[in-house]
């Protein structure tokens, strides 16, 4: 961690995330971390199970919990549940500096684009561009802009 603080840079989203994490002394919540790793490995049922009984300790962990549920259900193919959790994440987090609401909005744009509901897709892609958040800003906003470009004229 100290090496990241001394030699790290913030030119790329992943480096910014590592540097921000190194500068924050608090440890990540173990249940959220396990759920994220299980999700990344494609173990959606186990990731969902890891979040059973989770109790948020602050606003950020509460928001991440809702966001993680949306991501799990989305990749699990349970779109209606994902939409509900993404919408809740946006409602609770769009004015906070965390990336959860912005990425939820991006994911809703993607979902509605795939459903050929271009008006809704545009609404959520534009919402991303109007949010202020710290983590993954470059990649999330670029993906939202790419989504807008894809649906232009539809």
Kindly give the residue locations of the regions a language model identified:
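Extracytoplasmic and endomembrane cell-envelope/extracellular-matrix remodeling and assembly machinery
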Residues: 1-53
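Residue-level recognition of tetratricopeptide repeat
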Residues: 36, 71-74, 103-105, 110, ...
């Amino acid at each position: 961690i100290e090496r990241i603080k001394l030699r790290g840079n913030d030119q790329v989203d992943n480096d910014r995330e590592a540097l921000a994490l190194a500068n924050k002394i608090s440890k990540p919540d173990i249940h959220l971390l396990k759920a994220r790793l299980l999700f990344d490995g494609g173990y959606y049922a186990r990731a969902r199970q890891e979040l059973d009984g989770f109790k948020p300790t602050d606003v950020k962990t509460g928001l991440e919990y809702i966001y993680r549920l949306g991501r799990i259900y989305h990749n699990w193919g349970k779109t209606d549940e994902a939409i509900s959790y993404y919408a809740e994440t946006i409602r609770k987090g769009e004015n906070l500096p965390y990336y959860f609401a912005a990425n939820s909005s991006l994911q809703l744009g993607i979902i509605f684009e795939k459903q050929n509901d271009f008006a809704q897709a545009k609404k959520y892609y534009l919402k991303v561009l109007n949010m202020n958040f710290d983590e993954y800003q470059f990649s999330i906003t670029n993906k939202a802009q790419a989504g807008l470009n894809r649906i232009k004229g539809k």
